Structures are given as structure tokens and as C-alpha cells.
């Protein structure tokens, strides 16, 4: 039977404190959070027990069934969120690498939302794992993770990214500037909103979603993740522009990471990924067609679509 990890035990202790303060509404919400992580909290006169829930009970029928903590103040510094649409071992590698280079002085949680059917035990100890029935798509899985995000800063990481040093602290520090909306090491720019190319920045049109950090309140105010984006491609551009149209900047911040093969791209049949990419780009253009006022620079030449 699975043992409760650090994230589960922390929720249980917070529920004990809420009940002690007679904040029963919060205690009930924390109980639901525990259930979403696969554990039932059974109260005893001298404490409590944490009992694993059968996987089919622990799974949620939809991401929006995940209890939201967004109405409560952030009580952590950073939430690192991962989504799994296959290749759980890549995400496990990524979590382990970020944990091995954990920032000093920052309270960090890792949240995994799995839509691939992987077992929660596939991921490192200490990560909170939300199991979703079926794969509702990239945007919906990211929404589920956001609903559980307690950090003042939300960091999106793709399973193809591995940390080789402290990648979190530089991102958080860059977001201390209130004029900055989102940051990450991989930036892109465009001359015409149709073709995007990599750019070293510092200011860019969009941050690629392989590694992207944003303040939680900014992400929520911008509308969160668009669940129509079932495939990841261009969802990061759309999110970047929704944040930047609020008058905030996107900055490239160099961090110590390495990138492996993006298996969600390379293992998807070419015809399928091209069709999904085209649909996503049209969604972006529906919202931002003609908004060249949002472009940070012009320039000669293009190198094809990115995102």
C-alpha cells in the first residue's frame, strides 16, 4: 500500500490545525485535497490515521473537480507543476533533478497531474500527485495543477527539462520586478504574429512552456490556462500574450537546465501533431490577430513557427 508522502502529511497537519481553530470549512477543503491525493484522513481521539483510497476512487472525473486553493493566500513561495500525458519517467527525472538542486530559503512544492494512467508511485517522494481519468489535454491538466497551487510563484516545467543547478531562484528573483509578468530561459519573438523565432532577449514576445515562471495572482488574473489547447504547442504563446496585454513584460532569464528529447512532439505522428499545432495557432490568432502593438521588436528574417 502507498505511504503518505511529505505533501500529504503537511495537508493532514494543516487540517488538524484548522479543526483545532474550529475552521471547519477549511478543514473540509483540506480533507477533499487529501482525497484528491489518494488518502482518507480518519480522526481518532489521540490523533489521526491516513488510509490509502483505492486508485479508482482517488481518480477525478475532470480537472475542475480538483479542490481549489486559489481563494486562499499563498502559503508557499513556489509551486512547480508538471503534467503527464505519457512518459512518466521523464517527469520523474525532472522532479528528481529540481529536488537535487532545491533553492535555499524558498518553500517549494511539486505538483504532478497525470492524465496518462501512470501509478502515483512512479513519481518521487514529496511530490503531490493528482490522478485524472483519461487525458483531457494540456490546458485542462495545467488548470488542475493551478487549482492546487499554493505557491506565490507558479513554475511550469516540461518533462524534457532537467535541472543541473538551482533553476528556481533566478526565476523567482526576476519576478520580484512588478513590471515583469513571466520569465524563463527560452524566449521567442515575431515580426508579424505568424512566424516566431528563438531570441536571447532579455525582453521577448513569449516564453516557451518548457520552463516558464509567473506569479500566481498574475496567472489567475490573465484567465489561467485555456483548456481548448489539448496539445501543448502554441499554448505558451497564447498565455504569454494574455499576460503581456496586461502591460507586463516577458523576460529571458538564464538558468542551469538541459533539455532532452520532447517525446510528446517526436513520438506523435507527424500528421497528428501538425493538425493539432495548426488548430492551436488559429486559436491564438483568433484572439490576437492584428495585435502587432504587443511585439517587442521587428527584424529581418524568420525561421518558422515556434511554441
Model-predicted regions and their roles:
Residues 64-77, 101, 181-184, 191, ...:
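C-terminal, non-catalytic tails of nucleotide-sugar-dependent glycosyltransferases
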Residues 196-217, 221, 232:
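A recurrent flexible, glycine/aromatic-enriched loop bordering the glycosyltransferase active site
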Amino acid at each position: 500500500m502507498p505511504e503518505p508522502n511529505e505533501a500529504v502529511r503537511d495537508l493532514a497537519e494543516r487540517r488538524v490545525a484548522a479543526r483545532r481553530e474550529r475552521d471547519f470549512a477549511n478543514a473540509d477543503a483540506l480533507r477533499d485535497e487529501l482525497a484528491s491525493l489518494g488518502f482518507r484522513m480518519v480522526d481518532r481521539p489521540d490523533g489521526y490515521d491516513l488510509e490509502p483510497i483505492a486508485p479508482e476512487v482517488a481518480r477525478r472525473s475532470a480537472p475542475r473537480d480538483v479542490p481549489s486553493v486559489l481563494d486562499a493566500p499563498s502559503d508557499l513561495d513556489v509551486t512547480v507543476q508538471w503534467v503527464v500525458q505519457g512518459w512518466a519517467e521523464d517527469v520523474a527525472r525532472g522532479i528528481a533533478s529540481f529536488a537535487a538542486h532545491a533553492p535555499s530559503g524558498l518553500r517549494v512544492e511539486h505538483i504532478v497531474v497525470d492524465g496518462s494512467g501512470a501509478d502515483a508511485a512512479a513519481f518521487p517522494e514529496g511530490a503531490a500527485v493528482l490522478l485524472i481519468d483519461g487525458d483531457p489535454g494540456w490546458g485542462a491538466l495545467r488548470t488542475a495543477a493551478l487549482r492546487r497551487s499554493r505557491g506565490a510563484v507558479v513554475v511550469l516545467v516540461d518533462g524534457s527539462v532537467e535541472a543541473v543547478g538551482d533553476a528556481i531562484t533566478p526565476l523567482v528573483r526576476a519576478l520580484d520586478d512588478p513590471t515583469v509578468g513571466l520569465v524563463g530561459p527560452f524566449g521567442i519573438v515575431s515580426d508579424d504574429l505568424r512566424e516566431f523565432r528563438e531570441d536571447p532577449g532579455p525582453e521577448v514576445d513569449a516564453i516557451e512552456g518548457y520552463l516558464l515562471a509567473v506569479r500566481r495572482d498574475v496567472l489567475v488574473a490573465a484567465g489561467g490556462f485555456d483548456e481548448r489547447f489539448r496539445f501543448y504547442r502554441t499554448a505558451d504563446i497564447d498565455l504569454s500574450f494574455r499576460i503581456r496585454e496586461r502591460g507586463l513584460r516577458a523576460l529571458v532569464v538564464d538558468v542551469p537546465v538541459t533539455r532532452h528529447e520532447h517525446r510528446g512532439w517526436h513520438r506523435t505522428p507527424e500528421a497528428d501533431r501538425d493538425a493539432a499545432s495548426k488548430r492551436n495557432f488559429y486559436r491564438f490568432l483568433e484572439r490576437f490577430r492584428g495585435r502587432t502593438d504587443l511585439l517587442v521588436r521587428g527584424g529581418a528574417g524568420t525561421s518558422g513557427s515556434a511554441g
